[in-house]
Protein backbone atom coordinates (compact mmCIF):
# COMPACT_ATOMS: atom_id res chain seq x y z
CA UNK A 1 0.00 0.00 0.00
CA UNK A 2 2.79 2.46 0.70
CA UNK A 3 4.12 2.59 -2.88
CA UNK A 4 0.59 3.26 -4.17
CA UNK A 5 0.05 6.00 -1.62
CA UNK A 6 3.40 7.57 -2.49
CA UNK A 7 2.59 7.54 -6.20
CA UNK A 8 -0.77 9.13 -5.54
CA UNK A 9 0.75 11.86 -3.38
CA UNK A 10 3.47 12.50 -5.93
CA UNK A 11 0.91 13.01 -8.67
CA UNK A 12 -1.22 15.29 -6.49
CA UNK A 13 1.77 17.51 -5.74
CA UNK A 14 2.84 18.18 -9.33
CA UNK A 15 3.63 21.85 -9.60
CA UNK A 16 2.04 23.67 -12.49
CA UNK A 17 3.61 26.99 -13.26
CA UNK A 18 0.91 29.11 -14.93
CA UNK A 19 1.45 32.84 -15.22
CA UNK A 20 -0.27 35.62 -17.13
CA UNK A 21 2.00 38.31 -18.50
CA UNK A 22 2.38 40.76 -21.33
CA UNK A 23 3.96 39.62 -24.59
CA UNK A 24 7.75 39.45 -24.85
CA UNK A 25 9.88 39.42 -28.01
CA UNK A 26 10.86 35.78 -27.36
CA UNK A 27 7.14 34.84 -27.71
CA UNK A 28 6.92 35.80 -31.39
CA UNK A 29 7.72 32.40 -32.96
CA UNK A 30 5.74 30.41 -30.37
CA UNK A 31 2.60 32.54 -30.66
CA UNK A 32 2.71 32.70 -34.47
CA UNK A 33 2.95 28.91 -34.65
CA UNK A 34 0.19 28.43 -32.06
CA UNK A 35 -2.18 30.84 -33.85
CA UNK A 36 -1.62 29.17 -37.23
CA UNK A 37 -2.02 25.70 -35.67
CA UNK A 38 -5.41 26.72 -34.24
CA UNK A 39 -6.54 28.04 -37.64
CA UNK A 40 -5.51 24.71 -39.22
CA UNK A 41 -7.04 22.62 -36.41
CA UNK A 42 -10.44 24.27 -36.88
CA UNK A 43 -10.10 24.19 -40.68
CA UNK A 44 -10.69 27.95 -40.72
CA UNK A 45 -9.91 30.06 -43.78
CA UNK A 46 -6.27 31.02 -44.14
CA UNK A 47 -6.84 33.78 -46.64
CA UNK A 48 -8.32 36.96 -45.18
CA UNK A 49 -7.42 35.99 -41.59
CA UNK A 50 -4.51 36.31 -39.16
CA UNK A 51 -3.05 33.19 -40.76
CA UNK A 52 -1.60 35.17 -43.64
CA UNK A 53 -1.23 38.45 -41.74
CA UNK A 54 2.50 39.26 -41.53
CA UNK A 55 1.99 40.96 -38.15
CA UNK A 56 1.27 37.50 -36.68
CA UNK A 57 5.02 36.87 -36.83
CA UNK A 58 5.83 40.11 -34.99
CA UNK A 59 3.33 40.37 -32.14
CA UNK A 60 5.73 41.90 -29.64
CA UNK A 61 6.48 44.72 -32.06
CA UNK A 62 2.80 45.16 -32.98
CA UNK A 63 1.72 45.43 -29.34
CA UNK A 64 4.54 47.80 -28.42
CA UNK A 65 2.27 50.48 -29.87
CA UNK A 66 0.62 52.67 -27.26
CA UNK A 67 -3.01 51.94 -26.39
CA UNK A 68 -2.56 48.24 -27.12
CA UNK A 69 -1.80 45.16 -25.05
CA UNK A 70 -1.33 41.44 -25.60
CA UNK A 71 -1.71 39.13 -22.63
CA UNK A 72 0.03 35.75 -22.75
CA UNK A 73 -0.76 32.63 -20.72
CA UNK A 74 2.53 30.91 -19.98
CA UNK A 75 2.27 27.30 -18.78
CA UNK A 76 5.54 25.82 -17.54
CA UNK A 77 7.52 28.39 -19.57
CA UNK A 78 5.56 27.74 -22.78
CA UNK A 79 3.07 30.26 -24.23
CA UNK A 80 -0.27 28.43 -24.54
CA UNK A 81 -2.66 31.30 -25.15
CA UNK A 82 -2.96 34.98 -25.90
CA UNK A 83 -5.57 37.73 -26.05
CA UNK A 84 -5.14 41.40 -26.81
CA UNK A 85 -6.52 44.83 -27.58
CA UNK A 86 -5.54 46.93 -30.54
CA UNK A 87 -6.69 50.32 -31.87
CA UNK A 88 -7.59 48.95 -35.31
CA UNK A 89 -7.59 51.40 -38.21
CA UNK A 90 -11.02 52.81 -38.95
CA UNK A 91 -12.39 52.41 -35.42
CA UNK A 92 -13.37 55.46 -33.38
CA UNK A 93 -10.77 56.53 -30.82
CA UNK A 94 -12.84 55.16 -27.93
CA UNK A 95 -13.02 51.70 -29.58
CA UNK A 96 -10.44 48.90 -29.53
CA UNK A 97 -10.54 45.54 -31.20
CA UNK A 98 -10.21 42.31 -29.22
CA UNK A 99 -7.52 40.54 -31.24
CA UNK A 100 -5.28 37.49 -31.31
CA UNK A 101 -7.42 35.50 -28.88
CA UNK A 102 -6.15 31.96 -29.34
CA UNK A 103 -5.57 28.99 -27.06
CA UNK A 104 -3.50 25.90 -27.77
CA UNK A 105 -5.19 22.56 -27.15
CA UNK A 106 -3.23 22.33 -23.87
CA UNK A 107 -4.98 25.44 -22.52
CA UNK A 108 -8.60 24.75 -23.43
CA UNK A 109 -11.20 23.86 -20.83
CA UNK A 110 -9.07 25.01 -17.91
CA UNK A 111 -10.34 28.58 -17.44
CA UNK A 112 -7.24 30.04 -19.09
CA UNK A 113 -9.21 31.70 -21.89
CA UNK A 114 -11.63 33.21 -19.40
CA UNK A 115 -8.76 34.67 -17.36
CA UNK A 116 -7.12 36.08 -20.50
CA UNK A 117 -10.45 37.72 -21.40
CA UNK A 118 -10.81 39.22 -17.90
CA UNK A 119 -7.30 40.66 -18.03
CA UNK A 120 -7.92 42.07 -21.49
CA UNK A 121 -11.20 43.69 -20.42
CA UNK A 122 -9.46 45.21 -17.39
CA UNK A 123 -6.82 46.60 -19.72
CA UNK A 124 -9.57 48.14 -21.86
CA UNK A 125 -10.77 50.08 -18.81
CA UNK A 126 -7.23 51.15 -17.92
CA UNK A 127 -6.67 52.35 -21.50
CA UNK A 128 -9.97 54.31 -21.38
CA UNK A 129 -11.69 52.42 -24.17
CA UNK A 130 -15.49 52.56 -24.09
CA UNK A 131 -16.24 49.79 -26.60
CA UNK A 132 -14.59 46.54 -27.57
CA UNK A 133 -15.18 45.20 -31.06
CA UNK A 134 -14.21 41.76 -32.33
CA UNK A 135 -14.26 39.70 -35.47
CA UNK A 136 -14.45 35.92 -35.54
CA UNK A 137 -15.40 32.91 -37.63
CA UNK A 138 -18.47 30.66 -37.26
CA UNK A 139 -16.21 27.63 -36.71
CA UNK A 140 -15.07 29.11 -33.41
CA UNK A 141 -18.47 28.44 -31.84
CA UNK A 142 -17.18 27.92 -28.27
CA UNK A 143 -15.38 31.26 -28.42
CA UNK A 144 -18.50 32.97 -29.78
CA UNK A 145 -20.54 31.49 -26.92
CA UNK A 146 -17.98 32.84 -24.43
CA UNK A 147 -18.16 36.28 -26.07
CA UNK A 148 -21.95 36.29 -25.75
CA UNK A 149 -21.73 35.20 -22.10
CA UNK A 150 -19.30 38.10 -21.56
CA UNK A 151 -21.82 40.61 -22.90
CA UNK A 152 -20.82 40.93 -26.55
CA UNK A 153 -23.69 41.54 -28.97
CA UNK A 154 -23.65 40.41 -32.58
CA UNK A 155 -23.51 43.07 -35.32
CA UNK A 156 -24.84 42.94 -38.88
CA UNK A 157 -21.69 44.35 -40.48
CA UNK A 158 -18.01 44.92 -39.68
CA UNK A 159 -16.50 48.01 -38.08
CA UNK A 160 -13.06 49.40 -38.80
CA UNK A 161 -10.55 48.10 -41.29
CA UNK A 162 -8.86 44.97 -39.90
CA UNK A 163 -8.17 43.55 -43.35
CA UNK A 164 -9.56 40.18 -42.26
CA UNK A 165 -12.14 39.78 -44.98
CA UNK A 166 -12.94 36.13 -44.21
CA UNK A 167 -14.19 36.94 -40.71
CA UNK A 168 -17.97 37.17 -40.90
CA UNK A 169 -18.92 37.26 -37.22
CA UNK A 170 -18.76 40.78 -35.77
CA UNK A 171 -19.50 41.64 -32.15
CA UNK A 172 -19.41 44.67 -29.86
CA UNK A 173 -19.42 45.23 -26.11
CA UNK A 174 -19.58 48.36 -23.99
CA UNK A 175 -16.73 48.34 -21.46
Description of each model-found segment:
Residues 3-26:
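Conserved N-terminal entry element of GNAT/NAT acetyltransferase domains
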Residues 16-19, 94, 130, 167:
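Residue-level signal for beta-strand positions within conserved beta-sheet cores that form or flank
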Residues 1-4, 174:
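Positively charged, low-complexity intrinsically disordered regions
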Residues 130-133, 137-175:
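C-terminal "cap" of GNAT-fold acetyltransferases
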Residues 78, 91-92, 104-118, 127, ...:
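Conserved glycine-rich acetyl-CoA-binding loop
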Residues 26, 127, 135:
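Residue-level signal for short amphipathic helical patches enriched in basic/charged
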Residues 18, 22-106, 117-119, 123, ...:
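Acetyl-CoA-dependent GNAT
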Amino acid sequence: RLPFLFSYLSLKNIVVNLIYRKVKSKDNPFLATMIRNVIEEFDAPRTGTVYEDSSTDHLFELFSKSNSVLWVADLNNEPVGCCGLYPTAGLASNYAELVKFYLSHKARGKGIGKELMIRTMNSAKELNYEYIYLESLPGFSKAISMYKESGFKQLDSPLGNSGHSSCDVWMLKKV
